[in-house]
Amino acid sequence: MSVVVQHVEEKAVHSWSRISTAGKKALEEALLVFNPMSQDLSATEAQLVAFLQGLRDDGFQPTILRSGDVYGYSSCTANPPSQTKLQARAPNPTATSPPASAPRTAMRLPAGRATLLPMPLSGRLAKASTPALAKHATTNLLLSSLKQSSASHARGAAVGFPTHLYPGVYPAMRLSVVLEALVPLKTPMPCLGAKHKAQSLQLSLADSPLKLRKSSGKGPGNPRPKAPRKTTSKGPKCLTRKGPGAGPRRGSGHQSKTNRATGSPSVRRMKGGSALGTKTAQAKVARTLAKAARAQAKVARTQAKAAKARAKAKAAQVKAKAKAKAAQVKAKAKVMAAWAKAKAKAKAVRAKAKVARTQPRGRGRPKGSAKARTTRKGQKNRPETVGQKRKRAEEAKDLPPKKRTRLGPRSPKAWLGPGTAKLLKFRAIKVDRRSSDDEVRQRAQRILRVNLSPVIRLQPLLPYSAV
């Protein structure tokens, strides 16, 4: 059952835990008999009374509770019938009073609580439940309480389940409150407070069949504001409370006199039971809250520890990633430097090889020098005329001096060592007609102080200087 109230589920859990203490067999039987979604209300009510009788035969002390005690919603808002009408409709108490030997198994129940079913079902249920209980010779307590009132359907609905407050709740669900009857509630419920003004009915069990009678009460000047707990040798028993505005409680004085005469422990323990139960409940709630707070603190610490571990792992991962990236950049720079160095070295080797290929071989003279020398030798054999010499001199003056292309590099210091470069005082050896190969070689050796190098260039003298 699910109700909008927040604390309803907790109360349901407590009630189920109390049911399980009565034994597995009783729990299974209760589940089979009192299915909240049952459609057969007549059979369910008949089985309800039979089940209560069977529990009493087995030694249990079932206590019928209101739905508000179990599920949390308050049924005290219903308007109970007036006391005058109840007194007029109630049967003769002397005819329904049980023997005096059954005071220990007697239990008190509010009048509004006994009407667990709507009023329109009372007539059919009375006929259907009578043959089902013939074996136990038992009177249907629920129907007996309903027979006391012959009011209209509206009055019956007001006394019974508040259908206007919970329209979606099926009426048969109210029968499931009897599951709470195996073990009574440990603490009094607030819905049993001063709102309830109806007279309480006392259900007693003896060797004879179940009977319905009014409970005995004190005078009008002593209303009971709280519901104490009655403790017997078989277990605790929940007693209902009356509001401060309730009227006198009618019933047979024989029961109360018997209790006073026998000195039952319920009379002596009635005063401090409610306060003790309330303190116990408050202490239990405080312990539960403290335990929940400790659990929440433990969960928070665990979450903080996990978050710290995740942050630490993330920082270590970022640090490792940065370190790997720096190592990768360093390795890449190292590779690039080695590649550039190798490239420069290869380029220098290629340039050196190219220069070696372009330089002349042999005696170190340009190729055109031998031809010029042979030409000059041929001219020496044929003496020039005066007119030819004058003409060649004039042409030489008119023409600008020609720039001879250098076959080697511009600076011979690039191919010579620092010590050898200092010995080089001239860049070229000037020759004329009278210069021979031996003279040129000797001049070069004097300049370089080494063997002849291909860097030395031969430059012929101008024609006019040779005259």
Curated annotation (Swiss-Prot):
Compositionally biased region (Low complexity): 88-105
Annotated stretches, region: Disordered: 81-105, 211-280, 349-416
Keyword set includes Coiled coil: yes
Pfam families: CCDC71L (PF15374)
Entry coiled-coil feature ranges: 279-359
Modified residues (Phosphoserine): S129
Regions of compositional bias (Polar residues) in chain numbering: 253-265
InterPro entries: Ccdc71/71L
Keywords, in A-Z order: Coiled coil, Phosphoprotein
Top-level lineage group: Eukaryota
Biased composition (Basic and acidic residues): 392-401
KW Transcription regulation (keyword) present: no
Residue ranges with Basic residues bias: 349-380
Protein name, per record: Coiled-coil domain-containing protein 71
Lineage: Eukaryota, Metazoa, Chordata, Craniata, Vertebrata
